[in-house]
Amino acid sequence: MAYEPQFNPGETKIAENRRKHMNPNYELKKLREIADEDIVRVLGHRSPGESFKTVHPPLEEMDFEEDPMKDIVEPIEGAKQGTRIRYIQFADSMYNAPAQPYDRARTYMWRFRGVDTGTLSGRQVIEMRELDLEKVSKILLETEIFDPARCGIRGATVHGHSLRFDENGLMFDALQRYIYDEDSGHVVYVKDQVGRPLDQPVDMGEPLPEDELKEITTIYRKDNIGMREDEELLEVVNKIHEARTIGGFGMEVFKKDLNKRLGGANE
């Protein structure tokens, strides 16, 4: 019988949204159009039109000794061409952002190949070959995973995910990488992801309305759908907590040694 991954436990809308993100067979809804050159500008790793820098020759030109992995694993395009490793990093507001760090990590690992991802409380980085990174970044910025007001592209100085919004509903950004254009109603990036001024602004589109964000968010919140409303999720979390506590501390395994260290008899 073929294995069908569940992706994420839970019976609520929040759980279903998480499953949609992680499921590579689910087509993420495209919400905006961003030019490839604009994505390159915001990433800040190279200039539009500039060739990709490489760190080794194309794989087909390299002389490999016996290495079974090269026959087992199909390299991604950037690896084939030898392009360098680069990154994009997001900060997601805890106030109903479409994605959040652990959701991003699991989504990246399910959907993309050749990725290295790091998870922190208020930011999520994805590193991969630059050629492939730009293609992945386009997906992450144009689809329902991203909202220009609640998600920030921040390679440095990421603070703001837990802070209140400004008067235009934008998440706080200490480097002020983006602004709200009152004429168009769109969020516009005026700096790249590490805070360097751009030669020309990049339009990221209109922020999603609050009602829609509550429908697509992957964050449990008391003022939307609380975690305690999801019985299946709570059951899984409790099982993991119990297994880690009992098995992780290994109280039974080290019972005699622990008793001796506490001054008791070594039975």
Curated annotation (Swiss-Prot):
Protein's pathway: One-carbon metabolism; methyl-coenzyme M reduction; methane from methyl-coenzyme M: step 1/1
Keywords: Methanogenesis, Transferase
GO molecular-function terms, A-Z: coenzyme-B sulfoethylthiotransferase activity
Cofactor: coenzyme F430
Annotated catalysed reactions: coenzyme B + methyl-coenzyme M = methane + coenzyme M-coenzyme B heterodisulfide
UniProt xrefs under Pfam families: MCR_gamma
Cofactor note: Binds 2 coenzyme F430 non-covalently per MCR complex. Coenzyme F430 is a yellow nickel porphinoid. Methyl-coenzyme-M reductase is activated when the enzyme-bound coenzyme F430 is reduced to the Ni(I) oxidation state.
Gene3D superfamilies to which the protein is assigned, alphabetical: Methyl-coenzyme M reductase, gamma subunit
Keyword Transferase carried by entry: yes
BP GO annotations: methanogenesis
Transferase recorded as keyword: yes
InterPro entries: Me_CoM_Rdtase_Fd-like_fold, Me_CoM_Rdtase_gsu, Me_CoM_Rdtase_gsu_sf
EC main group: transferase
Residues that coordinate or bind coenzyme M: R123
EC numbers: 2.8.4.1
Function: Component of the methyl-coenzyme M reductase (MCR) I that catalyzes the reductive cleavage of methyl-coenzyme M (CoM-S-CH3 or 2-(methylthio)ethanesulfonate) using coenzyme B (CoB or 7-mercaptoheptanoylthreonine phosphate) as reductant which results in the production of methane and the mixed heterodisulfide of CoB and CoM (CoM-S-S-CoB). This is the final step in methanogenesis.
Family: Belongs to the methyl-coenzyme M reductase gamma subunit family.
NCBIfam families per record: met_CoM_red_gam (TIGR03259)
Subunit structure: MCR is a hexamer of two alpha, two beta, and two gamma chains, forming a dimer of heterotrimers.
UniProt name for this protein: Methyl-coenzyme M reductase II subunit gamma
The species this protein was found in: Methanothermus fervidus (strain ATCC 43054 / DSM 2088 / JCM 10308 / V24 S)
Lineage: Archaea, Methanobacteriati, Methanobacteriota, Methanomada group, Methanobacteria
